[in-house]
Amino acid sequence: MAHQAHAYHMVDPSPWPLTGAVAALLMSSGLAIWFHLHSMTLIVLGMILLILTMIQWWRDIIREGTFQGHHTPPVQKGLRYGMILFITSEVFFFLGFFWAFYHSSLAPTPELGGCWPPTGLTTLDPFEVPLLNTAVLLASGVTVTWAHHSLMEGERKQAIQSLALTILLGLYFTALQAMEYYEAPFTIADGVYGSTFFVATGFHGLHVIIGSTFLAVCLLRQVLFHFTSDHHFGFEAAAWYWHFVDVVWLFLYVSIYWWGS
């Protein structure tokens, strides 16, 4: 590589944006084929290619930042802005679901019986599993903050323990959510209530799984001595994402489970 007289990272040529684009094409085409022809071959192929792309792309980023020293302060600043903009885009993504929910519930149409929840629909008790889920996610927010402070203070063992605890709480939340879906007295096909409930809580659940995976990678990197007390943006990004997931759940709980029922 030629000598560069600036602190910015000139990225090497990479095949992963191309393979990622092909994976996206396969998955979107595969989704249409699955809906109409009931064949999952293409969507599964797309998913496998996407997972392989993500693993290898992120492996390259870890190599560049941890072992090659490309993540200088200006580069880290750019990554921070990128993560902030990504989380902002996610906020607007969920805003659409809340909009759909409030549009339907604040002025219920005669087809719904003029009331909310719609006539004849049994809702979930907000003070049972949903309240436990709220407590679990809030506790995980505390443990991820504990992990961050341990990391900044060089308390390696505490950082590993608190990070592992956060991941366990995330998995517990996912298991409780799966159980709740399995036992729910309504389905996604039960009108606008069922569709807004399952789409909003389902996408949140997907974000919890993504966040847990993100934190699991950080745990592995912490075990392998990748992070130092002043160079750990990978973990910081995961913590920001986890807090975002936390806050979205609080809005979901208050809006859909408590007020909406």
Swiss-Prot record:
InterPro entries assigned: Cyt_c/ubiquinol_Oxase_su3, Cyt_c_oxase_su3_dom, Cyt_c_oxidase-like_su3, Cyt_c_oxidase_su3-like_sf, Cyt_c_oxidase_su3_a-hlx
Keyword tRNA processing recorded: no
Pfam families the record matches: COX3 (PF00510)
Spans traversing the lipid bilayer: 16-34, 41-66, 73-105, 129-152, 156-183, 191-223, 233-256
Predominant location category: mitochondrion
The entry's keywords: Membrane, Mitochondrion, Mitochondrion inner membrane, Translocase, Transmembrane, Transmembrane helix
Superkingdom of origin: Eukaryota
GO cellular component terms attached to this protein's record: mitochondrial inner membrane; mitochondrion; respiratory chain complex IV
GO molecular function: cytochrome-c oxidase activity
Record EC number: 7.1.1.9
GO biological process: mitochondrial electron transport, cytochrome c to oxygen
Mitochondrial matrix side: 1-15, 67-72, 153-155, 224-232
Residue intervals annotated with topology Mitochondrial intermembrane: 35-40, 106-128, 184-190, 257-261
Segments forming a coiled coil: none
Enzyme class: translocase
Reaction(s) catalysed (UniProt annotation): 4 Fe(II)-[cytochrome c] + O2 + 8 H(+)(in) = 4 Fe(III)-[cytochrome c] + 2 H2O + 4 H(+)(out)
Membrane topology value: Multi-pass membrane protein
UniProt subcellular location: Mitochondrion inner membrane
Role played: Component of the cytochrome c oxidase, the last enzyme in the mitochondrial electron transport chain which drives oxidative phosphorylation. The respiratory chain contains 3 multisubunit complexes succinate dehydrogenase (complex II, CII), ubiquinol-cytochrome c oxidoreductase (cytochrome b-c1 complex, complex III, CIII) and cytochrome c oxidase (complex IV, CIV), that cooperate to transfer electrons derived from NADH and succinate to molecular oxygen, creating an electrochemical gradient over the inner membrane that drives transmembrane transport and the ATP synthase.
Assembly behavior: Component of the cytochrome c oxidase (complex IV, CIV), a multisubunit enzyme composed of 14 subunits. The complex is composed of a catalytic core of 3 subunits MT-CO1, MT-CO2 and MT-CO3, encoded in the mitochondrial DNA, and 11 supernumerary subunits COX4I, COX5A, COX5B, COX6A, COX6B, COX6C, COX7A, COX7B, COX7C, COX8 and NDUFA4, which are encoded in the nuclear genome.
Similarity annotation: Belongs to the cytochrome c oxidase subunit 3 family.
Protein name: Cytochrome c oxidase subunit 3
Organism: Danio rerio
Lineage of producing organism: Eukaryota, Metazoa, Chordata, Craniata, Vertebrata
Gene that this polypeptide is encoded by: mt-co3
